[in-house]
Amino acid sequence: MKMRYILFLMMLLLLAVSGCTAIQKQEAPDKKVELTISAAASLQDALKGIKNAFEKEHPHIKVVFNFGASGALQQQITQGAPVDLFFSAAEDKFDQLVHEGFIDKKKSADVVGNELVLVVPKDSNIDINGFDDLTKTEKISIGTPETVPAGQYAKETLEHLNVWKAIEGKVVYAKDVRQVLTYVELNNVDAGMVYKTDALSSPKVEIAETAKENTHAPIIYPAGVIKNSSHSKEAKQFYDYLQNEASMKILEMYGFKGLNESK
């Protein structure tokens, strides 16, 4: 009789413990996740605003950005860098990753567009009103064309306008578009070619001329989830969030042009 009573008490205890465990599982918050986003340097300001809004809605996800030139970021991904999502400033760099199987085409889209502009320091002593005046300069900065999309577009534009050969020896190459902007801001160069979004972010430069669309390849920013992401679910959530109305308004506020087209 005593043994039965003890067994009965043990069963009650086991039921109580299993019940508490089930409740704890139900009430346990989502596990903290750190999401790594590799993004073009020109997206820096806009993405910080989107990150803040996203993290408020998804408190268990911490977004960490790795900003740089799209070509350099592409190389990092092919070499196995732990990245969850890539937001590029160049379609060719992005499409190469899709072709090589690093990005799922079904989880990729062309998100925004941009424009290429010629900028000069606001306090410049040289009268530069457009691309035709670049022969007056001593130094002009563009991104390294092989790794910096803005540099690639800049070279295309200057070649199209038959200016490249005349100024090639004056070119100061930069690691990304933000470095070009810094050179112009500090008067280290007489002019630079950057995205319109970067020019609008600086009170120290002014736009001398905007490159016509037919002078260079279309400036499109695609984004996509990395196939071997350790956090594919959360990466897809951020990917979807990038394309919602609130995020598009933030991007457009910084000068980007909305596209929102699936690839």
Regions from the PLM with identified roles:
Residues C20-N52, G71, Q75-T78, A90-E91, ...:
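Exported/periplasmic ABC-transporter solute-binding proteins
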Residues D84-S88:
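Periplasmic-binding protein-like
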Residues H60, P82-V83, V189:
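Short, high-confidence coil segments that cap the C-terminus of an alpha-helix
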Residues L35, I61-V63, L116:
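Conserved beta-strand core positions
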Residues M1-Q26:
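Sec-dependent N-terminal signal peptides of Gram-positive bacterial secreted proteins and lipoproteins
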Residues E100-K107:
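A short, gly/pro- and small-residue-rich
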Residues N52-V64:
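Signal peptide-proximal N-terminal region
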Residues F67:
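Conserved strand-loop elements at the edges of beta-sheets that form or border functional pockets
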